[in-house]
């Protein structure tokens, strides 16, 4: 399972999850991705379970990129202990996820959109946050250029 090799401090505050993801919110490696819709903590076990589900489904077809890393320790006290006597020991690691964050990416020549969608759906069940499937649109640049050309033409027509 994923966890940092070493950290500066053993224990962290829980913190607050406000706003949307400003980093890691675009597809960088593959053609298809799983994007978070709400905020939450994703544990190292959940990441590993999702990864296994996707890998089993695509077999050896493509490649999977994990875009989140559990770098926040969550501490817990032993059961039936009295209040006080300090903060508990780190029990597991979580990745803080905000809306818009890309969790997993998938790509490769053998991967079709249907296969990627089904693999991501299997991974989705293992995660505590609501997610959606997104893909890179290959004709993304062409329509935007046409719109600017059309808008320039319409502006010229209006001037005349």
Swiss-Prot record:
Function of this protein? Answer: Binds 23S rRNA and is also seen to make contacts with the A and possibly P site tRNAs.
- Name the keywords, alphabetized: Ribonucleoprotein, Ribosomal protein, RNA-binding, rRNA-binding, tRNA-binding
* GO molecular function annotation: rRNA binding; structural constituent of ribosome; tRNA binding
**CDD domains given in the database record:** Ribosomal_L16_L10e (cd01433)
Cellular component annotations (GO), alphabetically ordered: ribonucleoprotein complex; ribosome
- Name the record gives this protein: Large ribosomal subunit protein uL16
- Family, as annotated: Belongs to the universal ribosomal protein uL16 family.
What organism does the record attribute this protein to? Answer: Prochlorococcus marinus (strain MIT 9215)
Subunit info here reads: Part of the 50S ribosomal subunit.
Annotated region (Disordered) at 138-160
GO biological process per UniProt: translation
